[in-house]
């Protein structure tokens, strides 16, 4: 079998069809900001960060995707800018993936941490008297088995996902009750202050169904953008106003770095995170291939087997958006292959991190559209092998255990290849 076969990229990142001229202009302003490399003085980069631009993480197969292969932007960022002042942790390699590191427990070894510990630091600033920064001791934490990783989630079609009403998600969930596969699941409802770490940070989650991030920890694209800007690049903003560095001697600016600019005109009024969210909101989903890999007949058979084996109970083929003021997002079928709910994935995939109502073993069903171009699989990018990623779902205690063990694994080799071809066509 060839589980790692993917067709050539079908098309670059593009806006949704049906957008108006002003909406296209907003999309273009957003993608420009998404691609921009932020700087320390001009933008407030750091003093702790993982990279210096959104597009560095979300790069494959194009802007808005996930971790690129072959040349890890974190490795490149270190070599070009930070070799004299930073150590490169052994889990950041040239071949990738891009990684975010979180510690499961605090230094006392008992209480939960769960927060992001940025890989790189900015040092040597002339106006930073008294500020002494050190990188986390990743080697020690790795020995303690206290480090877990996350890779970037793709944001293709994210505006369509944002427009799916809560009730549609709940109604779809209700159809699973009493199924013979052991699939349960639940939605993640998060209130302000509990999506990032245990620390209070009034970030806009308001008790509606959250749906973005590996654990569905963010309710909206604006919250998703604000958190990422703060956590991955150290840039405070109107939603996440607290610097990632807690030492008061390293608090260089008492107000957020990124804000709305009422003294400007046109789109320049908008904050960076508003532009990021607009780009993601208007970014089109991938177009599936009708014939690659394996041919149209194989893909068609694989799609039917995907449903028959129970995979589609979590990876729901389609949900529908509600009414939107943006016609391109209103009343659309969204072929995302996700129910946007949390599911218990068992011990093999558990990461020891809770976010909102999501426990250490629960993850949002990852949308499968765009899978044909994905290189790294699962939340931590542990494998490039699609079939292994499927097998990881049969972890003891996983809701998907029976689906994989009793249904997928009993397919013939030819049938399994059809399923893989279908997945790689998405």
Q: Positions of the model-derived regions?
A:
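Periplasmic c-type cytochrome electron-transfer domains
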Residues: 1-426
